[in-house]
């Protein structure tokens, strides 16, 4: 089958031929565009924008648009996009993935398709893996876009809704996948349309597309609200778990050394000692029989497996996970008495994110910090379904071809390998494999010292904060100066990475994926010039303007720009000399301390094309990847070799085993992602329906007609259910009266007319009750209008309230269904199909409950007389008393004469965003102050 696949797949050369022709068309425009003045070049944007919004296809505008960006980049950034960058840009515009090696200039590549697609006026999102890159790229590339007459926005954590809305309204918007996803969810929770911040999802260019669309796809985005449960049980469960003894599987000694298949065929009985055991491959923990007995005794329950003790069991299991599986300074860090998640792919702290399902609370109990209340899911979506909403999606990465099947299957994205501008001249050395971690770390330190002594810069890659700090301590003991970049030292990230290629530099970094800052051999003159200006007292804003190319600036900025240019030129001389010196030493040496579970992360660490350098991994048999996923052959090989811990093994013997372990891990993670998506696809259909209906309400759809339909539906369903018997004498009219009496029909209209109703057919009963209900609703509207309420606004508000409340309950119910649905497989039933069928029934129930809640609120909710409230509010604000009853007025006057006149302090007029004093719960500007 493989040869057929190869036969049907066009060669890379054939795929690139039409792209080369388009690149030729762009090149042909360069002489003409070079002659344009800055103003004439800017005017090109207005011309192209008018043509695009007039209906001309973007494909026809591509050569001119790309040529404009290239010329602008030469003038503003001092960089001319290479031909391969233009080809990469064309691929992105076509809605495909451009695989471009590290160092090929992906940031500048994205500028061309972003500019082209922004001409339509529908917005372009450039998605980065972290806030730092969004801010950095937004500022750097913003200089180019603004020069060409485009607006640029950056979405960062901590912005106000107004700032976010302004950023999204720009032609081009930079932001992280997290921020974009959460803003989408928040937009579908607002009560007023003007509070929404995002526009439609038009075109997205995803940087490090494999990290975002594949690695992070296992974790859904969740917006949570605080739950109501006490946190005491987390602390109690933690105290209990700390008393338990971890058990191990006891294998049959007669079958020791045999493969798992042989042991299974021989019927091996596996015993587990201790109170609990951990499956590291599945990252799960389970109580043994001994552990269950201890739990029952400790918590005073008879049977832990009783359904009534499910919640207690959940607390215990989460405490076990927190203590036996989750590692401090690997999975999370503790800062400022808070447990903070470390992103396993980037090594950064995930600010504001919490583990779900009570795990975060269990970790807080373990670390003896304040245990926050367990959260409740308010809204959720997976990255897969979020990014599939874009009309056009594309991405860039250095490593995507190996995952092409997943990109095509889930996102319908093809991968195109872009040839490198410079040949790959990095030297990748064989792995050094040690039997123990201890021996490996000693060898790593010795290798660093050996290379540092020559002046060669060394970048050490680790996969956890814990290992980076261990190596840092070992280097300090040996007197080696170095920098550490991890989740605890992220503030100086740009400075540390920028100087990692300096002569003699030693840098320890956790997960280099998506660092985004160039490592220049010999040092970075731009960074050095900026650093000097900061030391001299220049403000960051002045430095940013000074390093740009805008002509409309003050004399202060022009002076700062001249100073920056002078400093950069001086440092450039130094770094050029240092560059040649470092190249002579072999360039930057990359030293990996452990193989990552993804081969792509390893390749990203290995570094850039075009720069001379070398890379090597130091690994041990005790590393998690080999220990958990290495398989039986790796364990047998390790035990048979029996070498001492300081002697490296022949890596060639183990290369295939290591690669197989990584492939197994990648395959397992792919299955997890597929599994997550299969379930979320079911939820996504329901989410789209709810959000679509919600948006229609926000955009002013006639809600009144919907309310009437709801009343009709509820009455019709109730009559059909209670009057289903062919014999009218057996109709359950009492039940019908009880049900509709809690909604929209007075019970006496049914119980007081039973004989009449039994003479009618079901359609006639429905029509009669509907007419009664609608007449009551008309009177209710008259009453509430007299009270000063807008009935259409109340309908809108009550409907949104009901939808939001029931949708949250539905999410919880779906989570519970999903947690237990896997057990259906034991009954030979497909869990996915079972989930689909049950979730459909649950969705129907939710829709019915929304109808009931909305109608009940509109008919029966106690709503204050707003006019009376307003009179009282006016009296409170002005110090007057609006009393109509003359006797009451006389009584008040008499009381006033007796007590003497007392000054009344008039309250200040409420601000537009203050709560309205009438008590409606709305902001003043949306209530009594609406007409001001």
Predicted regions: what they are:
Residues 65-70, 92, 173, 209, ...:
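Core structural elements
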Residues 123, 259, 263, 377-378, ...:
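Substrate-binding beta-hairpin/strand module that engages nucleic acids
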Residues 23-26, 41, 45-52, 62-73, ...:
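Short amphipathic alpha-helical coiled-coil/interface segments
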Residues 16-19, 34-42, 55-66, 82, ...:
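Conserved phosphate/pyrophosphate-binding and hydrolysis machinery centered on Walker-type P-loop NTPases
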Residues 618-676, 681, 687:
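Arginine-glycine-biased low-complexity disordered regions
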Residues 446-491, 673, 677, 686, ...:
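Structured DNA-binding interfaces in DNA transaction proteins
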Residues 1-625, 630-642, 692:
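Conserved P-loop NTPase motor core
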Residues 664, 693-932:
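Acidic/negatively charged segments and metal-coordination signatures
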